[in-house]
Amino acid sequence: MMTLRHLPFILLLILSGELYAEEKQCDFPTVENGRIAQYYYTFKSFYFPMSVDKKLSFFCLAGYATESGKQEEQIRCTAEGWSPNPRCYKKCLKPDLRNGYVSNDKVLYKLQERMSYGCSSGYKTTGGKDEEVVHCLSAGWSSQPSCRKEQETCLAPELEHGNYSTTQRTFKVKDIVAYTCTAGYYTTTGKQTGEAECQANGWSLTPQCNKLMCSSLRLIENGYFHPVKQTYEEGDVVQFFCHENYYLSGSDLIQCYNFGWYPESPICEGRRNRCPPPPVPLNSKIQPHSTTYRHGERVHIECELNFVIQGSEELLCENGKWTEPPKCIEEKEKVACEQPPSVENGVAHPHSEIYYSGDKVTYRCGGGYSLRGSSTITCNRGRWTLPPECVENIENCKPPPDIANGVVVDGLLASYTTGSSVEYRCNEYYLLKGSETSRCEQGAWSSPPVCLEPCTIDVDHMNRNNIQLKWKYEGKILHGDLIDFVCKQGYNLSPSIPLSEISAQCNRGDVRYPMCIRKESKGMCASPPVIRNGDIVSSAARTYENGSSVEYRCFDNHFLQGSQNVYCVDGVWTTPPSCLEPCTLSFVEMDKNYLQLKWNFDNRPLILHGEYIEFMCKRDAYISETSIAGSVLRVQCDRGRLKYPKCTPRDRRLSFQEALRTRRQMEKR
């Protein structure tokens, strides 16, 4: 029975628990341009959050130092977080200054420190002065100190593939010279023209004209291209080909322009992604016409005059086959049309009291007007086809229409007359549909193209549908591209169709993800395999259903190699992981090899498999290997074994006392 005398002890426990909880203030620190000891990363959940007043060391990467200029420094956990903020800055070293001098003898400069330097007679600083002050910033010196020969004049360099605006070749300081590159060549900023200023230390930039290059092309799946180069010059054309049983989707020819490759590289699709020409019923026509038809595309069937459709007006391309086509059956009775529609500023010929299917009329416009559309319309089963318009003759068009996710790349003018045209290009990853060119005709532009949106993979949607990617996709997926999935282990497309590979098509930014369901049980598994230095997280059962899994864990300080989960597949377990032993630091081996630890934080009883530890030779010893000393003294733990490097003691002369001691020993003998 609890009494009042137990109350202080209980309160103490509660308060100390609250205080302990409040002390855990500091999360895992991120060290810019540096790191902390490896075991903190490995046992992150054990050490963090860290209690107030706890300390740890961090060290900087090569070429960086702490704010105080040290290679290693300690930080302390406070109620406000880590103090000081762990950060490493790029070291600012005293420059090796030719034809100049530095105002002090310091070798290393801390952050925000200033350094003053000057140049010898006849030389100027990078800013064109006799003396200059630079600051040590986090990325190095504010400007790299150097001394350049002072010049009263500048000589224009030889300009290949370009011309200067003047025949003059010698220029005074502050003179500016303009130059133009020949066709196909550009300045360093990618322009056709450029300027350079003559300064006391030479030209502000060296005039030059270079040929623009396009990047190398990535290989296409199930295809190849020719020619293959590391870089391509402007104007180069590359042709693409597909392997047997695959077809090109896109242009087979692409060209290197000053803005890059255009059009985009095609892809090679398999037979199942394409359909043959659609079956056209007798007495009909199809829209739209195309040279290729891809999975998911549709065509419209329209019967000829005096024929009616029986069945669906649309055909769908599905996995290389067309849906069932309709039939066009002849009408038994003629159907009359009303009088042709009237067109403003136009007349129709010939005139009749009654019109039947198949009858045609033609429109003509009055003076000062032109036809827009087909001049002839037809009576078709009681309805007239679309009549034309008579529009006023206007030569100029407004600026070309903008398109979503695309731009005009060629043909921009101050004004546009009939016959003018512009060329469109879609943004990266967007697929151009329609004609890339739009023309000005009688004051109106022909229809511009449409840029079809790409798709991005939705991982959450995939997880809900029990699927994963078959291949790794980089960046976006173009409209029309197929994405290959596989069912996750233990799942199938459906019980009746045991397919493991499934595909979906990108359609204007949308992907219809397939769904997999759990497989039917085909076999039970016995207890999961036993592993050395580890066990399973949950208690083992005698039997497991097909598709079930168990999770392994390693004993403390052991490194898990492989998948921590194994699965029961048709009565057999997948391969279990291995638990790799840690290494134990031996000070006996260190003394034998004249070694000591380079870093204090490496003084720990265990080093995990894969972790590195750095040694250094003791005083009056040197590394005996012929390799680079730094790499030899950095050792990795490999399955419980450390290969200690060997340092050799230096030869040294005997001291007076040692010589006297040696002499006495010799005399005793």
UniProtKB/Swiss-Prot annotation:
Claim: Secreted is one of the keywords in the record: yes
Tissue and organ expression note: Predominantly expressed in liver and kidney.
The organism's place on the tree of life at top rank: Eukaryota
Keywords: Blood coagulation, Disulfide bond, Glycoprotein, Hemostasis, Repeat, Secreted, Signal, Sushi
Record-linked SUPFAM superfamilies: Complement control module/SCR domain
GO cellular component, one term: extracellular region
Glycosylation sites: 163, 546
Keyword set includes DNA-binding: no
Range of residues in the leader sequence: 1-21
Main location class: secreted
Domain Sushi: 25-89, 90-149, 152-211, 212-270, 273-330, 335-392, 395-453, 454-517, 523-581, 582-648
SS bond partners: 26-77, 60-88, 92-136, 119-147, 154-198, 181-209, 214-256, 242-268, 275-317, 303-328, 337-379, 365-390, 397-440, 426-451, 455-506, 487-516, 525-568, 554-579, 583-637, 617-647
Gene3D superfamilies: Complement Module, domain 1 (2.10.70.10)
GO biological process, one term: blood coagulation, fibrin clot formation
Compartments (UniProt record): Secreted
Role, per record: The B chain of factor XIII is not catalytically active, but is thought to stabilize the A subunits and regulate the rate of transglutaminase formation by thrombin.
Subunit structure: Tetramer of two A chains (F13A1) and two B (F13B) chains.
Protein name (record): Coagulation factor XIII B chain
Native species: Mus musculus
